[in-house]
Amino acid sequence: MPHAALAGARGSLWWTDCLDLLARVPDGAARLVVADPPYAVAKAEWDEFDSLDAYVDWCDRWLAEVHRALAPDGTAYVCGFSEILAEVKARSGRRFAGGVRWLVWSYRNKANLGGDWGRSHESILHLRKARRFVMNVDAVRIPYNDHTRRYPERVQAVSSQYGGGVRRDRWEPHPLGAKPRDVLDIPTLCNGMTEKTDHPTQKPEELVRRLVLASSDADDLVVDPFCGSGTTLVVADRLGRRWLGGDADPAYVGMARRRLLATM
């Protein structure tokens, strides 16, 4: 039975599982879903599944609900390890008529304590319900590289695609920076960082902030069916979005509640 843990001016937090939470979203009401589900790597009791097929079947069930809940121009981000998300994409990606873009979250501040290639990235599927979808490029522009900063103006070749079909004698960098790329270089959270909680798979606020800025507008509804420590909800509230989140673990719901109370 779902339990309301917190109700705020912009949204509500629930102790419930993902399917129950998504069922609360009317058809087409969510502009954005950010999902950081269990990775099926047995990191904790809630991360254990009988088999990879069982995990993919489960993901397909809640992604069907995500598709229903999304607005016609809405999208969803799903976090995970590449080897697992490849299976999820193959099964569930076909639901999304706008296609699936594969993003990479890259971090360089995690020590390699094993005897193999050290993991320094995770993947994020960007699932688009339709070909026309919200993408606020200017909100998530990034700094230009060293070469562009050193030589900010240059002659534009006749064949250049940078002008969007408009011929210009010279190209100048955009004042807000370069367009975003599909590799996001953001440090992972480490002990001692202010935002760090006891959640084992907590995502950095900066990572989620970019996703929310890129794929939603002010007052849009942002949904997180695996809210964990509440990062998506905290970021959404700060950015003026409405939000709905839940988690099946009461300890994590408590973490999220405390963070939201400190933010709201």
Role assignments for model-derived ranges:
Residues 214, 259-262:
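Active-site catalytic microenvironments for nucleophilic, acid-base chemistry
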Residues 1-255:
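Core catalytic lobe of class I
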